[in-house]
Amino acid sequence: MNTKKTLALALTAALGCSLAGLAQADKLDDIIESGKLRCAVTLDFPPMGSRDAQNNPVGFDVDYCNDLAKALDVKAEIVETPFPDRIPALVSGRADVIVASTSDTLERARTIGMSIPYFAFVKVVLTREDTGIASYADLKGRPVGGTAGTFEALALEKDSKAWGDAKGSFRAYQSEADTALAISRGISTPRSSLPPSPPRGSSRASTRA
């Protein structure tokens, strides 16, 4: 399944979206006056966001933030933000825009504005090769988990409860690093992935998450 990712916005007018109003105009004015655009970016999710050998933020989402700031003639400021904190960072004013692989959902749209999609991912389930999991259905009755606050984790948690198997369980992890550690211990997790292949040492099962 492909899931389209969007920018989560507090400055819809800046991106040419149809939403308009005093609040958006004021926000854009504040950004231009400050001379910087603060982008909430997740930096443990390569190639979308990570750090290079010099500890500088790099990745597609980082580039997108830089391009957006350039279009506004301001300086880009990367605000490192874990997946669970993306929307809180925007709502609280710690960031002006989320550029962090955020799926557009109705629930999120009730709280924040969304841009048009800018990227599409393939949904996969990451497992250890020795788990014997070959399909999404094989996850029933297994310990599963995902990174808290992500669309994939929310969908898998919902399915895990719907399966009603007492042997199964779901756990949310606070970072991609914690999720990767769980995979190494035999927990299966959903993730947005760039085709064609998952990370070395993992097997890929189909998923509708």
Show the residue positions of the predicted features.
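Beta->alpha turn/N-cap motifs
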Residues: 41-45, 79-84, 93-105, 121, ...
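Short helices/loops that flank or line small-molecule/ion binding pockets
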Residues: 70, 79-80, 84-98, 111-113, ...
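Flexible hinge/capping segments at coil-to-helix
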Residues: 127-144
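Short Pro/Gly-enriched coil loops immediately N-terminal to beta-strands
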Residues: 112-124, 138-139, 206
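Ligand-binding cleft/hinge of the Venus flytrap
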Residues: 53, 65-74, 152-172, 202-206
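A ligand-binding cleft/hinge motif common to bilobed small-molecule-binding domains
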Residues: 85, 102-110, 154-162, 182-209
